[in-house]
Each structure stands twice: as structure tokens, then as C-alpha cells.
Amino acid sequence: MVVGPEGDFYLRPSAAPLLLVAGGSGLAPILALLEEALAAGAQRSVTLLFGAREERDLYALDEISALAAQWRASFHFVPVLSGATSDSNWQGARGLVTELIPKFLENGPHAYLCGPPVMIDSAVLMLRGSALPCDHIYADRFTPHHYPLAATA
């Protein structure tokens, strides 16, 4: 059985700052959320944490720059590489994207998470452990789906 999107990953009305955490291809829904918010005139501050393995895995950087330039409040973008070796030229954050979350919780943000299940689970545990209310945490978990293969003759 194939099930369509349920449509529960959208920006809730609020003036609270946004903490957006994306892992890998989870950036795409986060960008869609930001584009819709920008079109609606949102004026919430944004911190966007984007986790990838290597620098070559970072994508949509021009789109993120354009969004940041048009955003009506502060916009802080932090790419984080989990696979950057000490001998690489990477000057940005290293480690797991979820390890940076505690640095951005001081203003009681609403957290939107999108990416692989292990990232979502880790982020939710961290956010709940920091006393962020559960109704301020929204997640779109990427899970593998197994579809039966058509029989071949």
C-alpha cells in the first residue's frame, strides 16, 4: 500500500524563534517551509542547522543565501559536517548536527526537524531534556518504505 503525504509538517502560527534542524535530504522540506513563511511575511528569527557527511553533500546553498537575504528577521545558517576529517579544509562546524542544538535553545524556539530517524530521535530527546515543551517540537521523519516488487517472468 502506498500512502500519500499527510501534510502535518507545516509552520505553526507563533512569534517564537525558529530552530530548524535538517539532515541530508531533509533540507528540502525545511526550505519549502521557509519559502512559504517568507511569502506569508513571517518575521520570526531563524536558526537553520544543516547536517551532512561531507562538504560535497551540502546543497541548495545559493537558495539558503537568497532566503537569508530576504528574511525579515535574523537568519543564522550553520552547516555541520559529520565526516569532515581534521586534515580537510572545512572551517565550519563538525560533528553531529544534533550536538549543536543546545547552543540555540535560550529563546524558547519552536523546533522543526526533518531527516533520518536516528537524527530525529536524538534531537527530540535533546529538546525534551532541555525542557522545551513537546508542543514546540515538530518532526518529519524519513523512514524507509518497502514496496513489493512486481513479479518477473
Where are the language model's segments positioned?
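FAD-binding FR-type
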Residues: 1-20, 32-36, 54, 82, ...
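Phosphate- and divalent-cation-binding pockets in alpha/beta enzyme and binding domains
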Residues: 10, 29, 122-123
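Short, flexible hinge/linker loops that cap or flank conserved catalytic cores
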Residues: 11-13, 40-42, 105
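Catalytic cysteine-centered active loop of the rhodanese-like fold, especially the PTP/DSP P-loop
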Residues: 19-22, 113
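Short hydrophobic alpha-helical segments of the AMP-binding
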Residues: 36-37, 127
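Rossmann-like dinucleotide/flavin-binding elements
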Residues: 38-39, 153
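Reductase modules of NAD(P)H-dependent flavoproteins
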Residues: 45, 49-153
